[in-house]
Design a protein with these regions (language model features):
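N-terminal Rossmann-like FAD-binding beta1-loop-alpha1 element of flavoenzymes
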Residues: 1-29
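Conserved Rossmann-like nucleotide-cofactor binding loop
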Residues: 10, 35, 295
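Glycine-rich FAD pyrophosphate-binding loop
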Residues: 19-46
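Mid-domain catalytic core of redox enzymes
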Residues: 21, 260-383, 388, 397-401
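Conserved flavin/dinucleotide-binding core of flavoenzymes
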Residues: 42-44, 106-114, 335-337, 351-477
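Dinucleotide-binding Rossmann-like beta1-alpha1 core, especially the glycine-rich loop
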Residues: 47-136
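Active-site/ligand-binding neighborhood in enzyme catalytic cores
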Residues: 91-93, 125-266
Length: 477
């Protein structure tokens, strides 16, 4: 018997991959809240033609992890319900940052690299030259903060405006804390090996050209369609919540027991078994997969495995305010785009804003999502801000930046506590140590979810698949 803690997208995916293994008995999934889907939260307003997304809303279609997600979507019968945004779509081409008192369009082609594009004071081409002729770092580094790495290789402007704002969008994090080795491992490694990013990428590309030609796995199905149609990003009709809902239906059909509103009380490892107590009920398991945040798992392991618990608890998380705004006017935005990000150097209380109605059809509505806080949540809002306080800040920023001064016709304020892990310098080393501890002690425990190997939907689904493969192995009891 296998149990899974958490019914977010990674926990449900783990259940799906376990079901595919054909074990003698289907797994059971325990979820502490009253709903499934985790941080994926879609609120639909079918009569009005729009949706609010409190969490992720789009998925990227490129790379091995993305292909795995596309395969899963097709396998569960959602292939015909995918809603792609093509690379020539305005939401794919137009991405902005708010800096120096104005919205600035980021370059989307090579022409933007050879001319000066605000907020930068010189062409981005010169940043590449700085890296190319900058020489090697004075000492070999095991890891480095993203900001430090980019400033060292490409200059302060790129670090301040491009990378810092990008990390606000990826993980609501501070580039001066986030690990380059974890988020951009290939760039970090080629820089350390070859003494520069541009030089290293060129040399690596030349060296691998012939090797890769014979190793390319042909794309099939939805992944092949995504490439041939040149998707930039995609969602699913009805909002991203459709994916966990569909996974639940598949698991229900496979007689997987999904229990919500339950409390995990104790985890104890005995030999090669796991003793799990949930709502006073004792279960003896062959294996346990945890998809809950690392700090929550740490509480249950502290008594028996304090060293492991300490490392799990050391992974930091941040709070994010997400404010959905809907206006009954489709023509409020002067610039059509995916949205904009705000670099921390601007010292504003928001991380950015997504133009949902530019990405997907919201009928005769302008729909925006304002994100705020993250690594700076307490600095701006204190410990316990009210929803009214966050709404007021969001509306003020929308007014100042987008010149929208009317009240929204509907809105939703979400205060998401400890929702995004921060992959600080040394994160990869910590995660490697956590997994090594589990192997060294032969614990029948698998880990998946955003705490460890990536925050995106693709990352957590792949982490579920890898975890299932690792914990099941040859033992199919």
């Amino acid at each position: 018997m296998t149990a899974i803690l958490g019914a977010g997208i990674s926990g449900l995916s783990a259940g799906y991959y376990l079901l595919k293994k054909g074990l003698p008995s289907p797994p059971v999934i325990y979820e502490a809240s009253s709903r499934i889907g985790g941080w994926i939260r879609t609120e639909r307003f079918d009569g009005e033609g729009y949706v609010f997304e409190a969490g992720p809303r789009t998925i990227r279609p490129k790379g091995p992890a993305a292909r795995n997600t596309l395969d899963l979507i097709e396998e569960v019968g959602l292939g015909e319900h995918v809603h792609p945004i093509f690379s020539n779509h305005v939401a794919a081409r137009n991405r902005m940052i708010y800096a120096k008192g104005r919205l600035n369009m980021l370059p989307s082609d090579l022409s933007g690299v050879v001319k000066t594009v605000p907020p930068f004071t010189k062409p981005l081409f010169f940043a590449g030259l700085k890296d190319l002729f900058g020489g090697k770092s004075r000492k070999k580094l095991d890891d480095e903060a993203m900001y430090s790495f980019v400033e060292r290789r490409f200059g302060k402007e790129i670090a301040d405006y491009a990378i810092s704002s990008m990390l606000c969008g990826i993980c609501a994090g501070d580039a001066k804390q986030i690990s380059v080795k974890f988020l951009m491992k290939s760039l970090f490694e080629v820089e350390q090996k070859h003494g520069g990013v541009v030089k290293g990428m060129l040399m690596e590309a030349l060296g691998k050209k012939d090797k890769n030609s014979s190793k390319q796995v042909p794309l099939e199905g939805l992944a092949k369609r995504a490439k041939s149609e040149n998707w930039s990003i995609y969602s699913i009709q009805g909002g991203l919540q459709t994916l966990p809902n569909r996974l639940k239906s598949v698991l229900d059909e496979g007689q997987v027991d999904i229990r919500t509103d339950v409390k995990c009380e104790e985890i104890e490892f005995k030999g090669n078994k796991v003793e799990l107590r949930v709502d006073g009920e004792e279960r003896t398991l062959d294996r346990l997969i945890s998809s809950i945040p690392s700090y929550k798992l740490a509480k249950y392991l502290a008594k028996q495995h304090p060293i492991l618990a300490r490392e799990l608890a050391a992974i930091p998380f941040v709070d994010v305010g997400v404010i959905n705004l809907r206006f009954k006017n489709p023509d409020l935005l002067k610039q059509k785009a995916f949205g904009f990000l705000v670099p921390p150097i601007e010292k504003l209380p928001i991380l950015g804003c997504i133009f949902d109605s530019c990405c997907f059809d919201m009928e005769d509505n302008t729909v925006l999502t304002v994100m705020m806080g993250g690594a700076w949540f307490r600095q701006w809002f204190g410990e316990n801000p009210s929803e009214e306080q966050l709404l007021e800040v969001a509306l003020k920023q929308v007014n100042q930046i987008l010149n929208i001064n009317q009240k929204p016709d509907s809105y939703k304020v979400n205060i998401l506590r400890r929702c995004i892990p921060q992959y600080v310098v040394g994160h990869q080393k910590r995660v490697d140590g956590i997994k090594q501890y589990i192997r060294d002690h032969n614990l029948p425990l698998g880990l998946c979810g955003a705490s460890y190997d990536g925050v995106g939907v693709n990352d957590v689904i792949l982490s579920a698949r890898v975890s299932v493969d690792e914990v099941v192995g040859t033992n199919k009891n």
